[in-house]
Regions:
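Short, structured surface patches at the beginning of a domain
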Residues: 1-133
Length: 134
């Protein structure tokens, strides 16, 4: 099954940017939760986890790494688990796949670690700017 996972940080976000994708999916899951919440603690993250454990998902599409979370450790743990489960994770905004044609992508681990760290740093900057603005 080909699944797209989206996450919006707040209830006020429309998600239009995420729905402009015209790719056909078997299932689209949308969590409206902060990226600091662990992937497996999110309602749709839990649904996705069950489907993966049942062997029903072969491809997981995300718009960008930050949709999986803003905590580097949690994102990497989630990606490693998905890899163990042989799920090909595809990140649309950079066109990167974890397992193209079922074979591990050698550059995947490095790129996913760097990108996850950058998104965590971005979250810290947002928090800092929010505190200064109060």
């Amino acid at each position: 099954m080909k699944v797209k996972y989206n996450r919006l940080s707040s209830l006020s976000q429309s998600g239009n940017r995420l729905t402009d994708d015209k790719t056909q999916y078997d299932l689209v899951l949308l969590d409206r939760v902060s990226g600091s919440v662990s992937f497996k603690e999110r309602p749709k993250g839990q649904e996705l986890t069950k489907l993966v454990e049942q062997g029903k998902i072969s491809e997981l599409w995300v718009e960008e790494f930050s949709r999986l979370g803003r905590n580097t450790g949690d994102v990497i743990k989630t990606l490693e688990w998905l890899d163990e489960m042989k799920v090909n994770v595809i990140v649309r905004n950079i066109g990167l796949q974890s397992r193209p044609n079922g074979v591990k992508n050698p550059i995947w681990k490095m790129i996913s670690s760097v990108m996850s760290s950058l998104y965590e740093m971005e979250l810290e900057n947002i928090k800092e700017r929010t505190m200064v603005g109060r």
